[in-house]
Amino acid sequence: MQTLHVNGYDMAYLDVGQSAGNGLPLVCVHGSLCDFRIWSSVLGPLTRKHRVIAPSLRHFFPDHWDGIGDTYSTAQHVDDVIAFIEKLDTRPVDLMGHSRGGNICFRVAQRRPDLLRKLILAEPGGELDATLDPAYKPGPSPLAGMIAASAETIAEGDIDGGLQIFLDALEGPGTWRRLPATPKQMLRDNATTLIGQMRDQRPLLSKADAEAIRHRRSSSAAPSPRERSRRCCMRWQPT
């Protein structure tokens, strides 16, 4: 593990595959409740052709954040990823984001396309506005309510109870109970970040946002509602 001092914060990251002579840097950005460890199972395949650089976003493991303050937000994480890439010894980079990390990477590509060679969105998170979703209705989304219920339980000190609310609502009843010990511990290590996510005012994804992305891009198959975000992003991005 290494660190880069980014926007007043020491961002921890893994840098794997450089010794193999790989010339294509791939920066991997994790999603909610995760950290750089989430990529462990795919480092082998990825490092066959890439130098993989996987940061942990601000306030995620190995940091143990108390949930206090206003320094956890999508905007802050976008700023941090941009500054992180700027400090690397090689660029442009391929940028891959999973879930909430996909949303962050999408915003990075909007703001700083000069830093990127390719954008990969894996099950990207984010809510769609009326220009992309005819069924859009203003107001809090069901996801926001789920995050709030989970975060409030975590803030009261019931880490496992809060994580169970989140996982079971997102993936189905019994998901938390069935989860193996290792991924459970990673979620516990990052549980307080849901307190910050509850307060995050993440902007909706729009048709104009997607049309602004000009770089080569790729995206994985994803379940609803992430599938809608993925398809809309791909549909409206110019070739």
Task: Cite the ranges covered by each PLM segment.
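Conserved loop-alpha-helix segment in the C-terminal half of the alpha/beta-hydrolase fold
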Residues: 44, 207-239
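Active-site nucleophile elbow and catalytic-triad environment of alpha/beta-hydrolase enzymes
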Residues: 169, 193-209, 226
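A catalytic-pocket lid/entrance helix-loop region that shapes and gates access to the active site
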Residues: 122-156
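Conserved acidic catalytic loop of the alpha/beta-hydrolase fold
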Residues: 75-93
